[in-house]
């Protein structure tokens, strides 16, 4: 493994602050985590828990910046060959894929201009990506937003904070809504 891992947290580092491969959900195999770094960098800015059956892959020039209180339940596929940034308090549900590259560039027929194969991804603070979301290059999600199950995020979302997006591709469905993690207990 090449590359680097940095921990930047005021107040110091403590045992158990970063947990990778945690067995959270028995619906997925307890296979830990696959971690591949080809020379890039991962920065942890506080507590982080990434569940079992997950993969982190960082390319030679890739950069992943994970804000404090990051949580991904299980089977996260996180691939960076450019730049992915998560601000603080981001929650990721089951089986999400977040990738800042297509791995292939495309050429426009009319002009022969090339569409870049990569672009940064930015998930701002207090966002929640429900299960089975795909986040593609160039995605930017405002603070306190929710991406519904099976959503495809593929652009800079110029929407208000505290909005719900859904669909393939994801579009604005509702404003004035967010997940309050301090009041999130469901009683069945």
Residue ranges and their predicted role:
Residues 1-99, 120-126, 132-138, 143, ...:
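Domain-scale signature associated with acetyltransferase and cell-envelope carbohydrate enzymes
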Residues 112-121:
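A short acidic, glycine-rich active-site loop
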Residues 146-147:
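Short alpha-helix at the nucleotide-sugar/activated-sugar donor binding site of glycosyltransferases
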Residues 150:
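Conserved metal-binding segment of the jelly-roll/cupin
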């Amino acid at each position: 493994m090449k590359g680097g891992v940095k921990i930047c947290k005021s107040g110091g580092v403590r045992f158990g602050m970063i947990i990778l491969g945690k067995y959270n959900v028995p619906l997925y195999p307890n296979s830990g985590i696959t971690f591949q770094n080809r020379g890039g960098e991962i920065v942890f800015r506080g507590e982080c828990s990434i569940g079992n059956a997950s993969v982190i892959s960082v390319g030679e020039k890739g950069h992943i910046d994970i804000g404090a209180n990051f949580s991904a339940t299980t089977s996260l596929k996180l691939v960076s060959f450019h730049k992915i940034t998560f601000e603080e308090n981001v929650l990721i549900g089951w089986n999400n894929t977040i990738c800042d590259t297509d791995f292939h560039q495309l050429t426009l027929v009319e002009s022969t201009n090339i569409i870049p194969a990569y672009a940064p991804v930015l998930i701002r603070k207090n966002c929640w990506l429900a299960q089975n979301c795909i986040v593609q290059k160039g995605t930017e999600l405002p603070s306190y937003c929710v991406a519904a199950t099976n959503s495809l995020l593929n652009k800079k979302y110029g929407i208000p904070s505290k909005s719900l997006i859904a669909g393939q591709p994801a579009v604005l469905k509702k404003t004035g809504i967010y997940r309050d993690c301090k009041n999130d207990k469901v009683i069945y």
